[in-house]
UniProtKB/Swiss-Prot annotation:
It comes from Tetradesmus obliquus. The gene is petA. Belongs to the cytochrome f family. GO terms for molecular function: electron transfer activity; heme binding; iron ion binding. This is Cytochrome f. Binds 1 heme group covalently. The lineage of its organism: Eukaryota, Viridiplantae, Chlorophyta, core chlorophytes, Chlorophyceae. It is a single-pass membrane protein.
Amino acid sequence: MNFFTHKKNNFGSFVTIFSFLVALGVTNLTPAAEAYPIFAQQNYENPREANGRIVCANCHLAQKPVELEVPQAVLPDTVFEAVVKIPYDQQVQQVLGNGKKGDLNVGMVLILPDGFELAPADRVPEEMKKKVGKLFYQPYSPDKKNILVVGPVPGKKYSEMVIPILSPDPATNKNVSFLKYPIYFGGNRGRGQVYPDGSKSNNTVYNSSVTGKISNIAPFDKKGGVEITIETANGDSIVEKIPAGPQVIVTQGQTVQPDQPLTNNPNVGGFGQKDVEIVLQNPARIQGLLVFFATVLFAQVLLVLKKKQFEKVQLAEMNF
């Protein structure tokens, strides 16, 4: 299994992601707000904000459900699997960067507790490797190995992913204790509605910026983009450019108000996040618990035997 390392150089990061997508057969790399964790990597030192929201939600505005499954407790220095699920209707198609329709991609970020990290290939059992498949997980940054990202990858194939994780050992890592820890997961399907610079993609609704009457609706490029000219009360002409993708729902001669939709909302995807907890279990506690249970069981057996012995003595005295 080959795991990527994050490059500080933006071009190097894009080449890395592009190479891995080609290996997966993802050839439709339009410069659109896909499920790109690299956008978060380039713009945010930490993908989880102080209010608990994962930054992917800044570009993927619709909320959709996600699922995260991990063991309730794990032992130190143990490989376990986290299963993430990004469900969606796989019959629907999204608007691509060129305005045409295509299948949805998915992406995810998994924020593990400090000390937890992606399991080395030589520690992953063969059965788990088969579940992981050809997915390549990479750390969010060189100093954040506990944060893993992947995507964009084909949603039809990877709406469910298995991540092999290595738990830390407090005996060798003094920054880790036997405690209960939170795990944060964010997953999205489909393209985003906003780019990191705040500009809109063609996968969102476009609204009027003024009050006025629509005087003209005309195409402005070969891809299918449309210009909507709005005449205001003071005689100004405001041109709203709609890229190929969203469908215009207004007509010439119609009066519109500020923030009134000029198009439908073509977005069929969305982002969701899930928080769970996992316990790093102390083996000595388990051993102590087993000894306690064994002691209780032994005491119960002795009580039963003592009771039977007492009953026999009573019966003998009565017969005498």
